């Protein structure tokens, strides 16, 4: 494990021409203090956890005293926001410091979120508030523990500096990590802005640094598109399986690596509602839970359109190649999602006919507003007479559930497994704990009073979502009535 000064930064993105980024310096961040620190993320870059206690740590990761090799840049990109194309966006409050390369050869790009205004701030203050940084910090680590590809969070650094949103809040900086923060919108900017050479340069950069195995393909840019489609299908299937709604799936919030990125007004399902809208600014439900696969395809189509000049010199031929790649998305998503849901039901192998079993169950759950996480966690014990009454009681029509359960028993019978083995497998994929909005809100309320203990407690809990952790049982309870009044939006 390294000392802070031994971390060796490079910034490969900064080596690209000025058209790709700006070079602002981090704004002053008065009297900073540490709010939270993630030892698991620190281990990814070989940073010794004791280093987080040093003043130099806070100074380095608020951008005040750079470490060797740090070269801050803010990325430029465009994006479709709620379906409307915005030709220039960019990092309005974020700076990529550079990458740390591990002895194993992995590279982690470190980014400050909330570091102050940049050329892309569009008149905003370039700050993030404590509330939103806590939500992103906890969510990224919760999603990682659930097996969902995601950016990671190293630390939150706070300040008493006031930030003006719907109310006066305090400033914070989130240090987040990913192999890359390049987005679909990065390609859209150069494609629609009329910069074909820059578009090719960006694609070559992404292939060289993140998909080197594609470089020798006969059609490397088509292979890039196909790979991103496949990764995105896998990502969205995992969102749907764990009951996660992102809330703002603009193309500038879509990772070229298939990671969950830019946690804003997200939410995990409480009661199973297919049309769940977690973002109260999403008045038409464009980004509702059940719309996420469709929107992912739409966003991929935007990426494909941006890449058309690279797919074939003849536009019509390029369109056909893109369509063929996009046509595979639905099958890739369905295959992954069905396998994940089959595992949640304890099936060793998912068959085509199992889709009906899955969809019937979800229909029953929707009709009775059954808690998504708690039900699947409990379902593994349906064979136990002590558990079955509570399972039945969750449904408004217990007889309909009985009919489904009979078919489910018969399906399990074909596999001939012992109940204990099946239960163990189900407990390993059906979490007991997820980051419900009210849990995050309780941690935020304490943190705003300078008590960060609940942030740490939730972090430790969510690192082990599949473990019983009996001392934390209260965190697996149904949400309280007041939780329904929590509204989250893009304000951060």
From Swiss-Prot:
It catalyses: L-seryl-[protein] + ATP = 3-O-(5'-adenylyl)-L-seryl-[protein] + diphosphate; L-threonyl-[protein] + ATP = 3-O-(5'-adenylyl)-L-threonyl-[protein] + diphosphate; L-tyrosyl-[protein] + ATP = O-(5'-adenylyl)-L-tyrosyl-[protein] + diphosphate; L-histidyl-[protein] + UTP = N(tele)-(5'-uridylyl)-L-histidyl-[protein] + diphosphate. It comes from the Bacteria. Keywords: ATP-binding, Magnesium, Manganese, Metal-binding, Nucleotide-binding, Nucleotidyltransferase, Transferase. The active site is at 252 (proton acceptor). It holds the Pfam family SelO. Its cofactor is Mg(2+); Mn(2+). It is an enzyme of class 2 (transferase). Disulfide bonds: none annotated. Mg(2+) binds at residues 253, 262. Its EC number is 2.7.7.-, 2.7.7.108. One of its GO terms (molecular function) is AMPylase activity. ATP binds at residues 90, 92-93, 113, 125-126, 176, 183, 262. Belongs to the SELO family. Nucleotidyltransferase involved in the post-translational modification of proteins. It can catalyze the addition of adenosine monophosphate (AMP) or uridine monophosphate (UMP) to a protein, resulting in modifications known as AMPylation and UMPylation. This is Protein nucleotidyltransferase YdiU. It comes from Thioalkalivibrio sulfidiphilus (strain HL-EbGR7).
């Amino acid at each position: 494990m390294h000392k802070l000064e031994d971390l060796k930064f490079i910034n490969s993105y900064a080596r690209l021409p000025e058209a790709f980024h700006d070079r602002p310096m981090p704004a002053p961040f008065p009297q900073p203090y540490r709010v939270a620190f993630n030892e698991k993320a620190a281990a990814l870059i070989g940073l010794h956890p004791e280093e987080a206690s040093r003043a130099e740590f806070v100074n380095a990761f608020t951008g005040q005293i750079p470490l060797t090799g740090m070269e801050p840049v803010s990325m430029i990109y465009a994006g479709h926001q709620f379906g409307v194309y915005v030709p220039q966006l960019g990092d309005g409050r974020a700076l990529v410091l550079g990458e740390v390369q591990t002895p194993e050869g992995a590279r982690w790009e470190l980014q400050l979120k909330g570091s102050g205004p940049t050329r892309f701030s569009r008149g905003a203050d370039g700050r993030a508030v404590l509330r939103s940084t806590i939500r992103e910090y906890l969510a990224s680590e919760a999603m990682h523990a659930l097996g969902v590809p995601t950016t990671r969070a190293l630390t939150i650094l706070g300040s008493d500096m006031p930030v003006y949103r719907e109310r006066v809040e305090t400033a914070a900086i989130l240090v987040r990590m990913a192999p890359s923060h390049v987005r679909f919108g990065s390609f859209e900017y150069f494609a629609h802005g009329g910069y074909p050479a820059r578009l090719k340069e960006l694609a070559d950069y992404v292939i060289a640094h993140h998909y080197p195995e594609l470089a020798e393909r006969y059609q490397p840019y088509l292979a890039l598109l196909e790979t991103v489609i496949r990764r995105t299908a896998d990502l969205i299937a995992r969102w749907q399986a764990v009951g996660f709604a992102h809330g703002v799936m603009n193309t500038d919030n879509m990772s070229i690596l298939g990671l969950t990125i830019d946690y804003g007004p997200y939410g995990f399902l409480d009661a199973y509602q297919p049309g769940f809208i977690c973002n109260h600014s999403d008045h038409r439900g464009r980004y509702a839970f059940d719309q996420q696969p469709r929107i992912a395809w739409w966003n991929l189509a935007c990426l494909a359109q941006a890449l058309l000049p690279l797919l074939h010199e003849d536009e019509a031929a390029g369109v056909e190649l893109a369509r063929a790649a996009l046509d595979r998305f639905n099958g890739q998503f369905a295959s992954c999602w069905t396998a994940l849901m089959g595992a949640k039901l304890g099936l060793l192998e998912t068959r085509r006919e199992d889709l009906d079993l899955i969809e019937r169950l979800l229909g029953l759950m929707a009709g009775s507003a059954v808690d998504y996480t708690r039900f699947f966690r409990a379902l593994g014990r349906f064979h136990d007479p002590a558990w079955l009454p509570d399972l039945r009681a969750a449904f408004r029509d217990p007889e309909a559930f009985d009919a489904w359960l009979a078919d489910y028993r018969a399906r399990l019978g074909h596999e001939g497994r012992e109940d204990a083995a099946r239960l163990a497998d189900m407990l390993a994929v059906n979490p007991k704990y997820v980051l419900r909005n009210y849990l995050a809100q309780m941690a935020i309320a304490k943190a705003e009073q300078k008590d960060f203990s609940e942030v740490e407690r939730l972090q430790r809990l969510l690192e082990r979502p599949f473990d019983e952790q009996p001392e934390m049982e209260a965190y697996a309870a149904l949400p309280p009535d007041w939780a329904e009044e929590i509204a989250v939006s893009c304000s951060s």
